[in-house]
């Protein structure tokens, strides 16, 4: 199964609580932190919620 490399590119300061919670649930902390997650529907939905804050690459 494909995986997604997700990198936080913008800060969560001043963002709504649901976006902050999504970033934390994905395991992202500081700006430029990166995680690799499976490309399933749940993860894709989370990425869609914060698409303006992250860069996503398929690995």
UniProtKB/Swiss-Prot annotation:
The keyword Ribosomal protein is assigned to this record: yes
Molecular-function annotations in GO: structural constituent of ribosome
Any matching Pfam family: Ribosomal_L30
A GO CC term assigned to this protein in UniProt: cytosolic large ribosomal subunit
SUPFAM superfamilies with a match to the protein in the record: Ribosomal protein L30p/L7e (SSF55129)
Any one GO BP annotation for this protein: translation
Entries under InterPro entries matching the protein: Ribo_uL30_ferredoxin-like_sf, Ribosomal_uL30_bac-type, Ribosomal_uL30_CS, Ribosomal_uL30_ferredoxin-like
Keywords, comma-separated and alphabetical: Ribonucleoprotein, Ribosomal protein
Oligomeric form and interacting partners: Part of the 50S ribosomal subunit.
NCBIfam families with a match to the protein in the record: rpmD_bact
Family statement: Belongs to the universal ribosomal protein uL30 family.
Protein name (database record): Large ribosomal subunit protein uL30
């Amino acid at each position: 199964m494909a995986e997604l490399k997700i990198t936080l590119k913008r800060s969560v300061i001043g963002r709504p609580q649901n976006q902050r919670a999504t970033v934390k649930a994905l395991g992202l902390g500081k700006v430029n932190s990166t995680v690799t997650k499976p490309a399933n529907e749940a993860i894709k939905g989370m990425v869609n919620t914060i698409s303006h804050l992250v860069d996503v690459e398929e690995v």
